[in-house]
Amino acid sequence: MTKRAGRPSRPGERAAAEALAVAALAFIAGEPERLGRFLAISGMGPESIRAAARESQFLLGVLDYLAADEPLLIAFAAENTIPPGAVMEARDTIAGRRWERETP
């Protein structure tokens, strides 16, 4: 199975992807240990998260962070009853890339 570039994402898809990223941020912030690690890696302070969460690039970074930590990704996906791959789909949508599977 290969991937090919697909159509650009639609506005509704982008809003859904950003909502998933906000949910991921809430999940990370839901436990002090998770939040502390995120803040340490991102270099942000807790006071700047709320403003940063309004920026697409920050939300993209949240999804990258989540995708890079498989146990965290799986826990987030399970809590939100979504497949783990939905995080990368949302990431690609926010980044302006939309991928579709090639069908034989």
Where are these regions (language model features)?
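Metal- and O2-centered redox machinery and metal/ROS homeostasis
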Residues: 1-104
